[in-house]
């Protein structure tokens, strides 16, 4: 009986200990894979901004939009498997400079004088695209102003 007891105990211990090992790790360990940092989803008029939270869209040319229809594309950020990089300098407790004078985290935005200095715009923002967005906004304002004059 003792001859079969020892191999049985070893077999049981082996079975129990192999259940404790993580089986789905990549070769070389979890830190062997390169960081897959990506930019956050584009949002706002002309996709000129980046998502800072599920309902926050900010860009250097447009400021910050919170809870507006332009932020709907930011909701899909919650469903993506990897985190994103918003860009900008760190500010506040856990925020980043999102627009000139504005510091945002994933939940809210606050005015912050640290962000008045040289806000780093997103790498993918094309200056010609920003000009067209600014031009679109200016044209809309002019159209609204001219409509207001005709009504009087």
Swiss-Prot record:
GO terms for cellular component: extracellular space; secretory granule. It holds the Pfam family Hormone_5. Residues 1-19 form the signal peptide. GO terms for molecular function: neurohypophyseal hormone activity. The keyword Signal applies. Disulfide bonds join 20-25, 40-84, 43-57, 51-74, 58-64, 91-103, 97-115, 104-109. Keywords: Amidation, Cleavage on pair of basic residues, Disulfide bond, Hormone, Secreted, Signal. The modification Glycine amide is found at residue 28. It is found in: Secreted. The keyword Signal applies. InterPro entries: Neurhyp_horm, Neurhyp_horm_dom_sf, Neurohypophysial_hormone_CS. Vasotocin is an antidiuretic hormone. Belongs to the vasopressin/oxytocin family. This is Vasotocin-neurophysin VT 1. It comes from Catostomus commersonii (White sucker).
